[in-house]
Regions:
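Acceptor-binding helix/loop patch of EC 2.4 sugar-transfer enzymes
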Residues: 70-95, 134-178
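Conserved acidic donor-binding segment of nucleotide-sugar-dependent glycosyltransferases
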Residues: 353-362
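Carbohydrate-associated surface elements
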Residues: 193, 215
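Aromatic "clamp/platform" in nucleotide-sugar-dependent glycosyltransferases that forms part
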Residues: 319
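Short hydrophobic beta-strand element within catalytic cores of glycosyltransferases
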Residues: 336-339
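Short alpha-helical donor nucleotide-sugar binding micro-motif in glycosyltransferases
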Residues: 298, 306-311
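Nucleotide-activated donor-binding/catalytic signature segment of Leloir-type glycosyltransferases, i.e.
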Residues: 280-302
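Conserved donor-binding/catalytic core segment of Leloir-type glycosyltransferases
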Residues: 228-247, 253-256
Length: 367
């Protein structure tokens, strides 16, 4: 096998949340183990990487590390010298947009020269800059799922006209992603369902989209043995990699509210972090279930596996999953699984989970 010089682009790569940094860590590690030279080019927050993998930091303004206007203004004013992309990033964020993908793509285009890499892997930025890079270097565009699905579910659960206006403004980058996706020569996605949705939502020929399912580290995600600990019969676990409607955490919280009187010892562990003062925290207060819920974040793979293995039931209440890692991880740990019958989840579970009809799921949320 020919050894390649591979560049991996990731516009943001938080190592413990959102999935992007975790994906970059795993794919770069495995490509290096195959003997390839791997360089990750990332915007902030930056990923954790294995030794021997180069990291090129491509900083923007990192405005979304805070939502305080004074802090954002300070970041902008302290940037010296300023480029057009810095001005664009600041003012688009100021009016409620999300400019990071576009500006990261422009910076990557200016950085990468024809002789730098044999191939470039893009981790779902789908930025205009990729079109120029593709003129001299082959690009494999990884699309986990079309972000149009996130927009759809946010709008579905938003009744405020003002809120709906800002949701549409935030997802303004989708027009760019649709245009760029059509022009990418090679697209990779982890499930048949994502292939269909990318084709439908982004107008991409399915023949251009290759399906390679993500793998589960079965050396780490394993059943618990008696020497390591014990299962708690009233302990339920779920994962919410982002505090957004798409992940469906509110359904599980409402279920805990209903079950706590029947099973006073019940406890839900959530792998993830809610937004401070956000919808999830408000819902927990409204349902008066804070004593039954705990959140855990910044966990290693081994720590996550232990949390799964100690639980009696795992729940995946997502409304959409391009590839549901929590589904596969729970099954690998031999934990009984309840999951929504949506998107890629049935592809992963086959008959080995209790699947909940999405219509019943949504009807309960609307009550």
């Amino acid at each position: 096998m020919k050894k390649l010089n591979i560049g991996i682009l990731s516009y943001r790569s938080a190592p413990f949340s959102g999935g992007q940094g975790i994906y970059v860590y795993e794919i770069s590690k495995l490509l290096k183990e195959l003997g390839h030279k791997v360089t990750v080019i990332s915007g902030p927050p930056y990923p954790h990487l294995e030794k021997g993998i180069d990291l090129i930091k491509l900083p923007g303004l990192n405005l979304f590390s805070t939502f305080n206007f004074k802090d954002r203004l300070k970041k902008f004013l302290h940037k010296r010298p300023k480029s057009f992309d810095d001005y664009y990033e600041f003012f688009v964020a100021l009016i409620g947009g999300f400019p990071e993908m576009k500006t990261f793509g422009n910076r990557a285009r200016n950085l990468i020269k024809p002789e730098d890499f044999d191939v470039v892997i893009d981790n779902q930025s789908l930025a205009y800059g990729l079109i120029d890079i593709q003129q001299h270097t082959p690009i494999l565009s990884v699309i986990h799922h079309p972000i149009s699905k996130d927009k759809y579910f946010e709008l579905l659960f938003s009744r405020s006209i003002i809120r709906r206006f800002f949701i549409k403004r935030w997802y303004g980058f989708l027009r760019m992603q649709k245009n760029v996706a059509k022009r990418m020569e090679y697209i990779l996605t982890p499930s048949k369902n994502s292939q269909i949705d990318i084709s439908n939502d982004f107008g991409v020929d399915k023949k251009k989209i290759t399906i390679i399912p993500n793998g589960i580290d079965s050396n780490t995600f394993t059943p618990l043995n008696s020497r390591e600990g014990f299962k708690n019969n009233f302990r339920i676990i779920t994962t919410a990699s982002a505090d957004v409607p798409l992940k469906g955490l509110s359904f599980t919280l409402r279920a805990i509210h209903y079950l706590k009187d029947l099973y006073p010892e019940i406890h839900l562990t959530v792998i993830g972090q809610p937004k401070s003062g956000g919808y999830t925290e408000r819902l927990i207060d409204e349902l008066d279930i804070s004593e039954y819920i705990s959140f855990k974040t910044n966990l290693s793979k081994a720590e996550i596996a232990f949390e799964y293995a100690c639980s009696s039931v795992a729940i995946v209440s997502s409304l959409y999953e391009g590839f549901g890692f929590p589904v596969g991880e729970a099954m690998a740990c031999n934990v009984p699984l309840i999951a929504t019958n949506v998107a890629s989840i049935p592809e992963i579970t086959s008959n080995y989970a209790t699947l909940i009809n999405k219509r019943l799921h949504l009807r309960y949320q609307m009550l």
